[in-house]
A protein has these predicted regions:
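Surface-facing alpha-helical segments and adjacent helix-coil boundary elements at the starts of domains
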Residues: 1-167
């Protein structure tokens, strides 16, 4: 239950019009009965209802709300899973906004792996995504390089990634 509350506080700090109470109440409705991944999806869907309809504005707010230090330990006891809903938000709502979503995944993966998100982009925008991942494979940040490795393994169980021309 701390994850939705923490996300609400983070967003409200940079977007004062954010309705924390409604977001938290909606996110926590049925929350305890859900597994971890389902909780992440539920919060991501509530973000869609609580942030501006304009995806690019919503992503700007989400990214602005992140702690300034891009360390996986910033979430304290929650671990990086605090950022799982952010990754799911990009996966679900950003497919038609390639550049904005790539920027978001680049930033987010430095806090929590964006592998769950990048796979949808490999399916929808295979050539452009592979090109970007090729650039990222030489990035100075190890988390970005790890995304390239983890996000392009289609045969792992539970990846949800169908066969691509390169697999």
């Amino acid at each position: 239950a701390d994850v939705p509350r923490t996300i609400a506080r983070m967003i409200a700090a940079v977007f004062p019009r954010f309705d924390q109470k409604t977001f938290v109440r909606s996110s926590l409705d049925g929350y305890d009965a859900l597994e971890l991944m389902s909780r992440g999806w539920k919060i991501a869907h509530q973000l869609r209802h609580s942030l501006p309809d304009d995806y690019e504005k919503a992503v700007d707010i989400l990214l602005a709300s992140l702690d300034r230090k891009p360390e996986r330990t910033v979430a304290q006891g929650m671990g990086g899973f605090l950022f799982l809903p952010h990754v799911f938000f990009v996966a679900e709502y950003g497919l038609e906004h390639f550049e904005t979503s790539m920027r978001a995944q680049y930033v987010l993966t430095q806090r929590f792996t964006a592998e769950f998100s990048i796979r949808r982009y490999l399916e929808r925008h295979q050539t452009a995504t592979l090109s970007r991942l090729m650039e990222w494979s030489a990035d100075s940040n190890e988390d970005v390089r790890r995304l390239v490795s983890e996000g392009t393994r289609p045969r792992l169980p539970g990846t949800g990634l169908r066969q691509c021309a390169w697999s």
